[in-house]
Amino acid sequence: MARVKKAMNARKKHKKILKLAKGFRGSRSKLYRPANTFVMKALKNAYIGRKLKKRDFRKLWIQRINAAARMNGISYSRLMNGLKLSGVEVNRKMLSEMAIQDPEGFAKLAEVAKAKLA
C-alpha cells in the first residue's frame, strides 16, 4: 500500500474549508470539492462587496445632502462649491449626518455657501 505523505496537511486544509462553508446548503457544506468552490466564490464576492459598500455609502450621503440642500434653496453642486470657496472643510459623511440630526446647523452652512457664491 502506498504511503500517505500529506495526510495532516490535507486534513487541516479540508477542515478549514469545511468550517468556512458552514451554513451553506447541501453538498456545499459537506463535501470538500463543492465546498472549496463555493467558499472561494464567497470570499471573492465578500472582497467585491467591501469595495461596493464604499461607493454605495458615498451615493447615499450625496443624495441626503442634495435633498437637504434643495430644502434650503440651493443645489448640491452649488452647495459644495460654495463651502469649498468659503474654506469650510466638512466631509460628505458629516454633512449628511448634519442634514438629518441638526437641520438648523446645515441651514447655516447652506447660507454660508450661498453668501460666498453671491
Swiss-Prot record:
GO MF term list: rRNA binding; structural constituent of ribosome
UniProt keyword terms in alphabetical order: Ribonucleoprotein, Ribosomal protein, RNA-binding, rRNA-binding
Any one GO CC term of the record: ribosome
Stored NCBIfam families: rplT_bact
InterPro entries per record: Ribosomal_bL20 (IPR005813), RIBOSOMAL_L20_CS (IPR049946), Ribosomal_protein_bL20_C (IPR035566)
Family per record: Belongs to the bacterial ribosomal protein bL20 family.
GO biological process: ribosomal large subunit assembly; translation
Function field: Binds directly to 23S ribosomal RNA and is necessary for the in vitro assembly process of the 50S ribosomal subunit. It is not involved in the protein synthesizing functions of that subunit.
Protein name according to UniProt: Large ribosomal subunit protein bL20
Keyword Ribosomal protein attributed: yes
